[in-house]
């Protein structure tokens, strides 16, 4: 090997090392953020799965890690500043009404994806009287959704008209349905589709009864104030992730298969078809109002006749709209 060739190879090797070092240094300097997600896959959270798996957070200069826990635990972690961004609008709004310093920053699902799915012998909602329904724990989104719909529209109360067994994760509720440990369960679209394939029946969609923000991210007020740029980057990544769902069917199906542990491509495609138009970064004022009103019912202990406070105080709408405008979008009203 000639001296010139050796020199060229040595220079090339040096450049590779230097370039690799620069990349490692840049990655190490990325702000680290923790992003909450619920146990088991959730149809409401598909854009956040995409933002992590497809590198959208990294593209915005954020080093993101998922933290999986129960919904209530995630809200408390956001309040304690242990997790920066948490997609729990139901529990978050309840905490805000009690004075928690939390705010909504960016949306995910703009429609309810909850169903009450039953064993095939249940023909109508009234057939659930005297039966056992699998729910989340009281105060969590799926519990509230089921109790409000059954109470408000069918005059059925937990403990009086039907029994309740609580489960931390949706896959456990699917298994209980299949094993006939329960006759009904609150399931999001993806898990309901899985149960339906096993012979179960989607009895009702709660979105037909109450509007729903789902997966809307909350953060501590101090984080938004002290790390405005980080919050803005997070919003940008989520805007792109919401767009990705509509624009990239195959990539989204891959993510669905991973997070819902689905090997059946046809089932994953069916889930995609259910949710492909469900997402958007906006937090529409009418849906926000419906969210808070659904948390101020007698079933949840809200005093009768007590009015809602000004709920716009619970949204950093200026930052969200500013980010959307910078991305060439007109914020929806």
Where does each model-flagged region fall?
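N-terminal secretory signal peptides that target proteins for export/translocation
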Residues: 1-5
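Pocket-lining segment of extracytoplasmic ligand-binding domains
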Residues: 90-92, 160, 169-260
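Conserved C-terminal helix/tail region of periplasmic/extracytoplasmic solute-binding proteins
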Residues: 296-333
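C-terminal segment of classical bacterial N-terminal signal peptides
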Residues: 17-26
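Secondary-structure end/capping motifs
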Residues: 225-304
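Sec-dependent N-terminal signal peptides
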Residues: 6-15
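Ligand-binding clefts/hinges and TM-proximal coupling segments of bilobed small-molecule sensing domains
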Residues: 141-160, 237-267, 309-312, 323
